[in-house]
Amino acid sequence: MKKFISSALALTLIASVLAGCSSNTASTSDPGSAPESSTPSSQVESNIQEEQTNTEKALALIGTFASGDTETARELLDENYIQHNLAYGTGEDAFIGSVEYLASADGKTTVENIRSFEDGDYVFLQTVYNFAGAGEQVAFDIFRFDEDGEIAEHWDNLAALAAEPNPSGHTQIDGTMEVTDLDKTEENRELVKNFLYDVMQGNNPDKTADYFDGDTYIQHNTAIADGVSGLNAALTALAEQGIQMIYDETHLILAQGNFVL
């Protein structure tokens, strides 16, 4: 069966990233009874980490923006955490500082995850943030995990949540959310890889129609209508203004089932 690209989640680039203490309780046994064995707290934390999927860990980390839970953030982060958001410092302490700042801010921070998937050591999240009441933003977050299951690196893009839907009535966050077709992950990854090379990088533009099922194409860009025709119209309008959309290099393609980024 021929595979087609059917949907696009398009957002504008910008930025976001914003995370200890621990308490132990001791118990005593009755005189004469054998002392009860206990598990060190560090081992308990390790066991909890191992029981969570990487997606669950990533969701727990972004949740600390709203909860102010610096202890959880520190447990999840590698101490040499690398931050690629140019507005924030790199390292575990910088992340913790951001969480502490949000917790002390007058405005409330909210975090609403919309969709997620994971690919090996990487987790992708699409989330609506409102940092300290400054306004809702839609974000793409990518987290990389190290060999110990800790979050070691982060990239993100943010755009303001549009007040109105696009010309076809779609928003930045509606559409398919469930991850399906896990057996087609690599097939879908290859499809998008070839699409980027042939069409977006301009190597074989005549193949554009091969990647779509006629004019069926759901668009989530705030300014572009559905369909290949809608995309072509938008690109033509940009070209008339002297604006080009240029893809020089594909650095990373993440995929799980029916989602590819």
Could you tell me what each predicted segment is?
Residues 16-20:
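C-terminal motif of bacterial Sec signal peptides marking the signal peptidase cleavage site
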Residues 22-24, 30-261:
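C-terminal and inter-domain tail/linker signature
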Residues 1-4:
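Positively charged n-region of N-terminal signal peptides that target proteins for export
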Residues 7-13:
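Sec-dependent N-terminal signal peptides
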